[in-house]
Curated annotation (Swiss-Prot):
Disulfide bonds join C23-C29. It comes from the Eukaryota. Ca(2+) 3 binds at E24, D30. The modification 4-hydroxyproline is found at P9. The lineage of its organism: Eukaryota, Metazoa, Chordata, Craniata, Vertebrata. The carboxylated form is one of the main organic components of the bone matrix, which constitutes 1-2% of the total bone protein: it acts as a negative regulator of bone formation and is required to limit bone formation without impairing bone resorption or mineralization. The carboxylated form binds strongly to apatite and calcium. The uncarboxylated form acts as a hormone secreted by osteoblasts, which regulates different cellular processes, such as energy metabolism, male fertility and brain development. Regulates of energy metabolism by acting as a hormone favoring pancreatic beta-cell proliferation, insulin secretion and sensitivity and energy expenditure. Keywords: Biomineralization, Calcium, Disulfide bond, Gamma-carboxyglutamic acid, Hormone, Hydroxylation, Metal-binding, Pyrrolidone carboxylic acid, Secreted. GO terms for cellular component: cytoplasm; extracellular region. GO terms for biological process: biomineral tissue development; bone development; brain development; cellular response to insulin stimulus; cognition; glucose homeostasis; learning or memory; negative regulation of bone development. It is found in: Secreted. This is Osteocalcin.
Length: 49
């Protein structure tokens, strides 16, 4: 059963989700994240995760 039209809830909150959203807004960070992973890409652009 869907709740609030959001689909199934995540089994646990993703602590990196806010950083993922920031990185996705930067095309260079987003592209790098596809290659090396979110944490490494985020660190290169924005500092420690």
């Amino acid at each position: 059963q869907l709740i609030n039209g959001q689909g199934a809830p995540a089994p646990y909150p993703d602590p990196l989700e806010p950083k993922r959203e920031v990185c996705e807004l930067n095309p260079d960070c987003d592209e790098l994240a596809d290659q090396v992973g979110l944490q490494d890409a985020y660190q290169r652009f924005y500092g420690p995760v």
